[in-house]
Amino acid sequence: LLHLYSWPITSGGALKRNLVLALLTLLLLLPFCKKKEPEEPTQEVFFEVKAGESTSRIALRLDSLDIISHHRLFVISAKLKGLDRSLQQGVYRLHTNMSEDSVLLMLSRGAIATVAVTIPEGLRLRDIASRLTKAGVVNQDTFLALCRDKKLLLEFNIPFGSFEGLLFPDTYSFPLGILPEDVLRVMVRRFFEVAEPMLREVSLDTLLILASIVEREAYLEEERSVIASVFLNRLREGLPLESCATIEYALPRHKERLTYADLRIPSPYNTYINTGLPPGPICSPGKASLEAVANPKKTKYLYFVSKGDGSHYFSQTAAEHEQMKRKLNKERSRNGA
């Protein structure tokens, strides 16, 4: 640090003054040159640097929370290192009794605190909002309201009434304090990043709605593209999709087994009584289901029925389908199912 005080030596008095100033500066900065040993157990503190906040104000707040011990030394160090205008906005995970130098380094590098959240495939908006809320990222009610916000939907040119299906399943690292609308934007942009190549071949509504149905209907990876082909074939033939997954979406609560009465509920999502696509997606599909719809297996299948073990029987005709259903029902009766 002596090079900071390289004035010309014109007299003994000037030399003495320069040496005294240099020694004083070294003494001031001494706490930054060694790690401070905490006198008592440290406690984790979440500290927010606000937009436009001055270094002196930040230092005073750090001192008041016992994160640092010398707010003046923090300010001096920031100025000497040219970092007094480089402290970045955000929420930081700090602890009490840190050295001023360590805190300064974290705040100038923008080493903000983050939280990781994994969103699996096939979740609905309410389930995603619940996971984000449990992780401390958003408030559930606020987030769900934003998922139906018309301005945000218009921002992404979404043709549906909500962001159902568009919050892409992935593992995210969100900074603490992130705005809920920015959480939504991150997840929607991730969807379009993944789906962009597929949207060159298939419209958004067809891709997303069918992929969401495939996500809920398919259990085995190798069957996704076959199931997608069944629904696409039925659309081309003008037949109802007849997806149990859409009935489950329309029901007010989850049921382990659907009844014939459920298949007649009056809902635009009831694909047993309505032809064409339902009004929107029924969950957030993963990449595999999106790809299955964009590149379906070439088949003539129009029907499938669950074997009960996750796999399905596929049929080309209604007669073959009914025969297979009777066979499965007999097997289940014998097994007491």
Give residue spans per PLM region.
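Leucine-biased recognition of intrinsically disordered, low-complexity hydrophobic segments
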Residues: 1-4
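Positively charged n-region of N-terminal signal peptides that target proteins for export
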Residues: 15-18
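Bacterial N-terminal signal peptides
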Residues: 22-29
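Signal peptide-directed extracytoplasmic domains
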Residues: 34-196
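Bacterial extracytoplasmic/cell-wall-associated proteins, especially those involved in peptidoglycan
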Residues: 130-138, 144, 152-337
